[in-house]
Amino acid sequence: MTTEPISAAEIARARAEHPLAFRAPLPVRLRRAALWTGFSLLIAWCLYDFGFSPIRIWEGLGRLGRVLSFMFPPHVWTEWREFSEILKGLGETLSMAFLGTLLGAVFAFPLSFLGAKTINRLPVLRFGVRRGFDVIRSFETLILALIFIRAFGLGPLAGVLAIAVGEIGVLAKLYAEAIENASNKPVDGVVASGGSRLQSIRFAVLPQVLPVLLSVTLYNFESNVRSGTILGIVGAGGIGFLLADRIGAYRWDEAWSIIFLIIAMVYLIDWLSGLIRARFIGTWEGAR
């Protein structure tokens, strides 16, 4: 099958009959130009206000290269006392992330039903609950840790509470969205069979959303392991405290060895959580 080329006259006739198909109207073009100009001016102002310059970037890269050169050779702990301190810090960070995620999930699970429009039919109550989720999420975990450190003192307890409170807002919102996206057909089947509203939630909604809730919780746990490292730097204990101590003392070889251990721990947790998702969700995709 062959097609003949379109002549210039046909193109000109089509342009005359349908001008908007070839070029946007003038108001649209002006609006686009204004948006792109404002966007470019905003970027330029940010770069100027932040002191961006090629010379500064080049000098910073040089200093960064010197810091990275301290990675080799990495430090190897020869005394069990020093290495046990590092392992204890890793264990504290892992415990903070686990307990904080667990406590957050325990409180977020029932609250998510109050925030789901398919379950809570009271708009005023649902609106208040959802805005409460927003208020909790507006506080960064690091800020919560500083507040709890002032209240409960230094140590992992402040980190656990900071992660737990932050997770309530995040997990409750994600749980509520998963519940809202559940299909209503199983619910209608349970109700048609004479089941109550609670039974429809138990036997129709939960089987659909539990795999999603598990996947979200595991992902947040992985993220909280990394957050636990940062919380340790501000005094919440864990491996972050030891890392900040080594960096402050310019013991870069030990600092980089600790960073390597953190990377290995995060990788191991990701692998294990992938196996758990594969076991309960029925797919090995997350474990690849």
Provide a role label for each language-model segment.
Residues 182-199, 203-209, 236:
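Short helix-to-coil transition segments within interhelical loops
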Residues 197-231, 253-262, 269, 273:
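Transmembrane alpha-helices
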Residues 1-102, 114, 118, 281-288:
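N-terminal, non-cleaved signal-anchor transmembrane helix
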Residues 111-145, 174-177:
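Cytoplasmic-entry segments and transmembrane alpha-helices of multi-pass inner-membrane transporters
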